[in-house]
Each structure stands twice: as C-alpha cells, then as structure tokens.
Amino acid sequence: MALHAAVKGKLISVIGDEDTCVGFLLGGIGEINKNRHPNFMVVDKNTPVSEIEECFKRFVKRDDIDIILINQNVAELVRHVIDAHTAPVPSVLEIPSKDHPYDASKDSILRRAKGMFNPEDLVR
C-alpha cells in the first residue's frame, strides 16, 4: 500500500475594499492559517495606512502566500512599501475596484516588469 502525501497549494491574498474581498471570498480564496490569520484584509476609508502597510508586510512574509492582489487605490496609499518588495514571490498584482478603474500608468510593478523585456525580443 502506497502512502500519498497531500500537498496543499499556495494561497492568493487580497487587500481591498469590501466588495473586492467579498467577491474573492465567494470565489473560494478565503483561508485562515494555523495562527488564525486570514489571507485577506478589508480596507475602508477609516483604515489607517499603517494597518495596510503591516498587513502587506505580513502577507509578504507568509510562506503559504504566492500572490497578493491589492486594489490599485489602496496600493497608492502604501506605494513605498510595495516598491520596496522586489522578490518575485509573492507576486503583487494591482487590480481595479468597483469605484476606481485600473490605471496602468500608476502601476509601478507593471512598469518594472516592462523594463525587464526588450521590445525587440518580443517581436521575434
């Protein structure tokens, strides 16, 4: 009889407004780790910037998270912390919210990724 070890996948985390978080939670991404820490944070107009920064830093340090989704308007509040994160994992993706459309010109991660490729290499 062979024993099979169950391999658990990595998580997606979300930092965003209530609608964004609820949407992703309904999609099944909600998890609480062994220390009872969730993989999401709901941000509203009363959330202190320091709390958002600490949450982002916690998500970056967690070894069970591979992707951090963050509303772009929230990312603007903690841009210096996001820009300081240079490791490929967890990947940080800025997403639109219901009230704030995505603006590629504000996405520093996208600009950094574009700088990694030579446009001439993509044509071939």
Swiss-Prot record:
Look up keyword Phosphoprotein and say if it applies. no
Gene name?
VHA14
Keyword Protease among record annotations: no
Q: From which domain of life does this come? A: Eukaryota
Molecular functions per Gene Ontology: proton-transporting ATPase activity, rotational mechanism
- Which InterPro entries does this UniProt record tie to the protein? ATPase_V1-cplx_f_g_su, ATPase_V1-cplx_fsu_euk, ATPase_V1_fsu_sf
Instruction: Give the matching NCBIfam families.
Output: V_ATP_synt_F
Subunit info here reads: V-ATPase is a heteromultimeric enzyme made up of two complexes: the ATP-hydrolytic V1 complex and the proton translocation V0 complex. The V1 complex consists of three catalytic AB heterodimers that form a heterohexamer, three peripheral stalks each consisting of EG heterodimers, one central rotor including subunits D and F, and the regulatory subunits C and H. The proton translocation complex V0 consists of the proton transport subunit a, a ring of proteolipid subunits c9c'', rotary subunit d, subunits e and f, and the accessory subunits VhaAC45 and ATP6AP2.
Q: What does the sequence similarity comment in the record state about its family? A: Belongs to the V-ATPase F subunit family.
- Role summary: Subunit of the V1 complex of vacuolar(H+)-ATPase (V-ATPase), a multisubunit enzyme composed of a peripheral complex (V1) that hydrolyzes ATP and a membrane integral complex (V0) that translocates protons. V-ATPase is responsible for acidifying and maintaining the pH of intracellular compartments and in some cell types, is targeted to the plasma membrane, where it is responsible for acidifying the extracellular environment.
Q: Which Pfam families match?
A: ATP-synt_F
Q: Which GO terms describe its cellular component?
A: proton-transporting V-type ATPase, V1 domain
Please give the organism: Manduca sexta (Tobacco hawkmoth)
The name this protein goes by in its record: V-type proton ATPase subunit F
- Alphabetical UniProt keywords: Hydrogen ion transport, Ion transport, Transport
